[in-house]
């Protein structure tokens, strides 16, 4: 629905339709701002996709972040909302090429702000791959992992999304030997504070008694559960 008059300066998906307010309050009619349209349509894609696979999408931050992924990929720009403000054409809604949001320090409990963390990870994945289309292939396939969780569980859900991304990128059913774009994905997500938890074991030989303050070098063996061994091979 376009040209709604019961509000201004916003647009929304209500579970059944996407809606855009008319020009008012110093804001353009958002139905003519392309990335806003893509963003709201992205909400519909996410919700209908999860519903079609038998579950209900629940996480607001991920929903906002995913909608931004669609918008910045289709417009091929990290800047969202150019043109929505009639009085200040330089005012924007969000951008992803500066001031990145990082988990957990930038998690504030506001879905649009927190969504910048996960969208930023996907945006940086595309930059690392030098390919929006390549990133979107992984992103689209990763949706089948159905990463989900209530608001407030973003730390767990973001990590699940990273794992889903690697599984989507995997081409031989063996994460232990890495994936074609493993470094691009892992480094992008890590830049935004999203990392996988590893099972780490240390082993070392018995240590002899040595005088205090005396250097005593010894060898330590570090075992890391795959796929983390791939990331540190040769280190």
Regions found by a protein language model. Name each.
Residues 235:
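Alpha-glucan (starch/glycogen) binding determinants
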Residues 39, 220-222:
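Buried hydrophobic-core signal for structured, non-transmembrane domains
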Residues 222-230:
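Extracellular acidic, Ser/Thr/Pro-rich low-complexity tracts
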Residues 207-218, 230-231:
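Short, solvent-exposed loop/linker segments at the N-terminal edge
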Residues 1-209:
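Extracellular protease catalytic domains of secreted zymogens
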């Amino acid at each position: 629905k376009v040209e709604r008059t019961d509000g201004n300066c916003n647009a929304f998906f209500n579970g059944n339709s996407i809606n855009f307010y008319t020009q008012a309050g110093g804001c353009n009619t958002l139905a003519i701002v392309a990335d806003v349209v893509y963003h709201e349509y992205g909400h519909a894609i996410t919700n209908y996709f999860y519903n079609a696979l038998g579950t209900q999408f629940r996480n607001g931050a991920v929903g906002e972040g995913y909608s931004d992924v669609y918008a910045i990929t289709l417009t091929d720009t990290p800047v969202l909302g150019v043109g929505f403000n009639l009085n200040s054409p330089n005012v924007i809604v969000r951008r992803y090429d500066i001031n990145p949001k990082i988990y957990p320090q930038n998690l504030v409990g506001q879905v649009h702000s927190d969504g910048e963390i996960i969208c930023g990870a996907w945006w940086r994945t595309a930059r690392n791959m030098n390919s929006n289309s390549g990133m979107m292939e992984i992103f689209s396939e990763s949706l089948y992992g159905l990463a989900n969780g209530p608001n407030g569980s973003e730390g767990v859900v973001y990590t699940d999304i990273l794992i889903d991304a690697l599984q989507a990128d995997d081409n031989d059913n063996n994460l232990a030997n890495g994936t074609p774009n493993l470094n691009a994905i892992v480094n992008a997500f890590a830049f935004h504070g999203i990392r996988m938890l590893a099972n780490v074991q240390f082993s070392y030989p018995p240590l002899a008694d040595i005088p205090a303050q005396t250097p005593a070098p010894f060898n330590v063996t570090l075992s890391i559960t795959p796929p983390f061994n791939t990331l540190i091979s040769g280190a």
